[in-house]
Swiss-Prot record:
GO biological process, one term: regulation of cell cycle
Name the record gives this protein: MRG/MORF4L-binding protein
Low complexity bias spans: 189-198
Sequence position, cross-link Glycyl lysine isopeptide (Lys-Gly) (interchain with G-Cter in SUMO2): 127
Record keywords, A-Z: Acetylation, Activator, Chromatin regulator, Growth regulation, Isopeptide bond, Nucleus, Phosphoprotein, Transcription, Transcription regulation, Ubl conjugation
Biased composition (Basic and acidic residues): 128-140, 153-175
Family: Belongs to the EAF7 family.
Assembly: Component of the NuA4 histone acetyltransferase complex which contains the catalytic subunit KAT5/TIP60 and the subunits EP400, TRRAP/PAF400, BRD8/SMAP, EPC1, DMAP1/DNMAP1, RUVBL1/TIP49, RUVBL2, ING3, actin, ACTL6A/BAF53A, MORF4L1/MRG15, MORF4L2/MRGX, MRGBP, YEATS4/GAS41, VPS72/YL1 and MEAF6. The NuA4 complex interacts with MYC and the adenovirus E1A protein. MRGBP may interact directly with MORF4L1/MRG15 and MORF4L2/MRGX.
Keyword Acetylation: yes
Residues modified as Phosphothreonine: 22
Amino acid sequence: MGEAEVGGGGAAGDKGPGEAATSPAEETVVWSPEVEVCLFHAMLGHKPVGVNRHFHMICIRDKFSQNIGRQVPSKVIWDHLSTMYDMQALHESEILPFPNPERNFVLPEEIIQEVREGKVMIEEEMKEEMKEDVDPHNGADDVFSSSGSLGKASEKSSKDKEKNSSDLGCKEGADKRKRSRVTDKVLTANSNPSSPSAAKRRRT
């Protein structure tokens, strides 16, 4: 088809989604009959009106840019279509592609009551969590007190063990002393020459 010519004037309009940034030279198009024919060919199967108008415009822009051999922003296409058609009226008259009936709606009282009860339960849970956050200090004191009593009990048991061991040591020491005394007496009796048994031996 024909090539689009660059002119000096620009047009104002809204940009659609997916539009790439372009230079001022690309934003101006001289709409010759050949260029308009390219636009109409690009619009086959796509209506730039209704709720999906921006998606259709993306397809129109891509096809139109491919036909004329240069990138054209969708703003330029919107502005040119606005000079030929009443786009706002067409948009309002476009039938929605899906059912969209409007009817009055009242939220059931049961749901409102459930929401209120849920809020009360959440508040109670938050209060319990706050109490648990404060209570761990008391629990730590209980742990410390119980550990202290355990420490005292272990100290008592160790002292009892020491007493028993010392008592056993004293008894063993006394027994050793008694044994040593007996052996000393026996030795002195055998070694004493004045004993009667030694005298008898000498006489014989």
